[in-house]
Amino acid sequence: MMAERVIAIGDIHGCAEALYALLEIVDPTSADVVVALGDYVDRGPQSREVIDQVMEMSKLCEFVPLAGNHELMMLDALSNSNAHKIDFWLHCGGEETMASYGGDVANIPDSHVDFLKSCRRYHEIETFFFVHANYLHHLPLSHQPDDVLFWQHLDDVPQPHVSGKTAVVGHTPQLTGNILDLRHVICVDTFCFGSGWLTAYDVLSGELWQVDKTGNVRLDSQW
């Protein structure tokens, strides 16, 4: 049975109040597919609470969590004694994540680590595909390199993908707070951890929901 809605959620970055408010207005059901585009952690103050929330989302809908580069950095730091890799993660927002766990790695539940490890590289449906950051237009999704899939910004807009599907991505913050819609690629990272919004976007209908990091809903007349 085809989903009633296929909803992409942009980069959350530790903004649990925004995620809670967004889910309240989107109200996902078992008839919906929700694809989270990664970067649940870092920068915002509530990474632990965000992971708690997203781990519960499979009870509400068909939930597809993608991995972002910040999840990769966190997992790399937790599994590695290399001081450079740990410092790199902390500098990129990991300090806020650690603070949400009381500043102690021992407070990070195994279930949270297991969730981060379970996040997918990509997801695709008939006419759309979802990745965290970017893609190489000539390669199938299964052959995309990590540095592009998780790290490459949209500074150089990719050509339409060989599959003919529209790409839905996060990672490149849209500082205006508005989604970037180039027809063949749509970016829904709208800078929630800064002065923007957390966005949910139904790719089937084009319906859009946005809240700021304190949970205020953006009204239609504001965009």
Spans of features found by a protein language model:
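N-terminal active-site segment of His-dependent metallophosphoesterases
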Residues: 1-53
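Residue-level marker for buried hydrophobic side chains located in beta-strands
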Residues: 8, 34-36, 65-66, 129, ...
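Active-site neighborhood of divalent metal-dependent phosphoester bond hydrolases
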Residues: 43-124, 154-158
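Active-site glycine-centered loops adjacent to acidic/histidine catalytic or metal-binding residues
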Residues: 11, 38-39, 68-69, 171, ...
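A general structural motif
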Residues: 3, 29-31, 60-62, 126, ...
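Acidic, His/Gly-enriched loop-helix segments that form or flank divalent-metal centers
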Residues: 91-197, 203-221
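Short, glycine/acidic-enriched loop or turn micro-motifs at the edges of active sites
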Residues: 13-14, 42, 71-72, 135, ...
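Short, glycine/charged-enriched secondary-structure capping and boundary segments
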Residues: 21-24, 49-52, 79-82, 144-146, ...
